[in-house]
Amino acid sequence: PFTRKIHKLDGKFYINPDGLEWKRAKWPKPVQAYLKYSEKVMTRYADLVISDNPGIETYIQDTYPWSKTTYIAYGTDLSPTTLTNQDAKVRDIYKTWNTYEKNYYLILGRFVPENNYETAIREFMSSSTKRDLIIICNHESNAYFEELRSKTQFDKDPRVKFVGTVYDQDLLKYIRKEAFAYIHGHEVGGTNPGLLEAMAQTDLNLVLGVSFNRSVAQDTARYWKKDEGNLSHLIDQVDAISDYSELGKLAKENMKQNFTWEKIVGEYEELFLS
């Protein structure tokens, strides 16, 4: 009904589907079916579907060929951390975690199954690295945490450390910058803000090689598959090299060219004023 009201006012109805919500494992089958149906209906009535990832735009075009689509990316903050290794909050948090700069792989994101925590943890545990795996997420009182503990027995590997949440954005930038590598397992499209934040701060990014992630990271990351042994082998490969600063420069340049908020806002302004 509201689309008719918009059109009566000579307005346009634009939608941004974000990702493929109906694919998320947290939803029961009836809810997934409803979300998939809603996706179809919204494309019927929208004047334009704006996708934040080329993979999402391709999916919309292929699945709903009647849709008019465009691509406008998501953005990220490229400013570096103001903290140094001498700051008290930096030293305190590393002391609490019993680790230090470049001595850890990092996972940071929503604590849900479709972000492939189980695969990442299993593969890390199978690797030979002596570095830690720092996992920043809201795991307290979460049934998924106990499920993972039961399935992987990560609590028996002292390298695997669930450290809770960190809300200080400047400190998070420092933690990202000083990670030896970031492991990204998100696969339910489209452009994930956490991946952009990692590419803007972390030199080495180990990214699940689905199309949504590849279209963002391009050739500035190392990719892995969910096949058993694939990520653990990659970890062992990269672990032998200490400096990935050149790859980090390429990643930051990619973010600067394609994912700044100035660029994104400008593209939306151009669309709305056209």
Locations of the language-model features?
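Membrane-proximal helix-turn-helix segments that form the acceptor-binding/catalytic region
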Residues: 31-49
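Glycosyltransferase donor-sugar binding loop
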Residues: 76, 108, 132-147, 161-166
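Helix-loop-beta element that forms the nucleotide-linked donor phosphate-binding surface
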Residues: 57-78, 82-86, 100
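A charged, aromatic-enriched C-terminal amphipathic alpha-helix characteristic of glycosyltransferases
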Residues: 242-273
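Conserved acidic donor-binding segment of nucleotide-sugar-dependent glycosyltransferases
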Residues: 221-229, 236-242
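Conserved donor-binding/catalytic core segment of Leloir-type glycosyltransferases
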Residues: 93-115, 121-128, 134
